[in-house]
Amino acid sequence: MSPQEKIDFSTKAKNLKSTNPQIRYMSMTVRKENVQEHIRADSNKLYNYMISKLLLNEMAKYDEVTFIPDPRTIKVKSGNSLPDYLQTQLWFEKQVTTKLNYQPISSDQSLNLQFADMLSGCIQSHFEDTNSINFNLLKDCISYKVLFF
């Protein structure tokens, strides 16, 4: 995308959020080089941990949740899958009966995931490239967490 297209996207994403308050933009950024080496040995574990920190409280509010991620990571080396991890966290940590439906789909087949990828790119540019133009347009409508470990 050109810089102007990114600005147009950010402006439209902000307008979408302001006219649809039920939509939530949530993000988590981690400084991976500060993560201990033994944790980085299986990056899926860190990914699973980040997903739970970002989404578990939101998921716990509902009786049933359909989680539709890109199938980037499903199992950690231990064999435990992200949906199993999230489901047990909901039941045991949050003590809720939320039913988690897990439907991974490739982002090239989902406009919603493409939208999320573009939103993520705006946030990534802020933290990694020090290009904050799009992030500054969106920051008031994004709930974001930064972990430095």
Language-model features: locations:
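Phosphate-ester processing/binding pockets and catalytic centers
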Residues: 1-149
